[in-house]
């Protein structure tokens, strides 16, 4: 029987240093950087409006389980700017302004290798920070992804935790019963995801 362990990423195997669970307080800074980088001459009110629109779609502010692609969110946020900057460039400048610093925890690689030695396939299921493109996030955690057999994110599967879709997708991918999967995470949302999917769960603090 194929054994599968699934890791959450943020707060479990890595973190963006100093960033809280909700990033809404950083949205204004991100949009300010877009304005400054491209010399758009956008007013303070327009920047604040863009930040507020992005805030309204933040799932930690207004609960949602369905994922929305980053490009759609940013197109809505800057609709009033009437600028001709490609949305991908806007997104890149936005996150440059936030100045993210990624740290992979010291134990992460050893833990992944331990499960592999024990015969497990190793997958991950992670919620992408609201508004962040999947490819951008993957670059931030590339050393981890290179060690993981299957990468699944809220952007790639279309649903955010605690929706069980991602875990069910992983079970189907490996052809295993969902009851035989172990999901490892750091917060109550992860535990609830496992409960709704009816698979096993461990808090990361209990195994490291």
Where do the language-model regions lie?
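Active-site neighborhood of HAD-like aspartate-dependent phosphohydrolases
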Residues: 1-50
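Short glycine/proline-centered loop/turn elements that form peptide/ligand docking sites
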Residues: 82-83, 109-110, 114, 163-167, ...
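Short, flexible/disordered intra-domain loops and linkers
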Residues: 17-25, 62-65, 131-137
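Substrate-recognition element of Asp-dependent hydrolases with the DxDx(T/V) motif
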Residues: 88-104, 108-140, 151-154
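Acidic di-acidic motifs
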Residues: 10, 185-186
């Amino acid at each position: 029987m194929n054994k599968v362990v699934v890791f959450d990423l943020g707060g479990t195997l890595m973190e963006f240093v100093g960033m809280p669970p909700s990033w809404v307080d950083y949205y204004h800074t991100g949009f300010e950087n877009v304005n400054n980088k491209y010399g758009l001459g956008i007013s303070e009110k327009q920047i604040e409006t863009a930040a507020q629109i992005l805030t309204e779609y933040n799932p930690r502010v207004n609960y949602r389980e369905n994922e929305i692609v980053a490009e759609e969110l940013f197109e809505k946020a800057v609709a009033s700017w009437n600028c001709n900057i490609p949305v991908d460039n806007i997104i890149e400048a936005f996150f440059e302004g936030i100045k993210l610093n990624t740290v992979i925890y010291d134990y992460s690689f050893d833990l992944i290798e331990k499960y592999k030695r024990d015969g497990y396939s190793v997958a991950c299921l992670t919620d992408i920070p609201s508004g962040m493109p999947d490819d951008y996030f993957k670059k931030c955690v590339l050393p981890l992804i290179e060690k993981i057999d299957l990468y699944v994110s809220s952007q790639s599967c279309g649903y955010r935790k605690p929706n069980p879709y991602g875990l069910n997708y992983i079970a189907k991918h490996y052809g295993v019963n969902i009851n035989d999967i172990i999901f490892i995470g750091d917060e109550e949302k992860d535990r609830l995801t496992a409960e709704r999917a009816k698979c096993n769960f461990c808090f990361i603090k209990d195994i490291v």
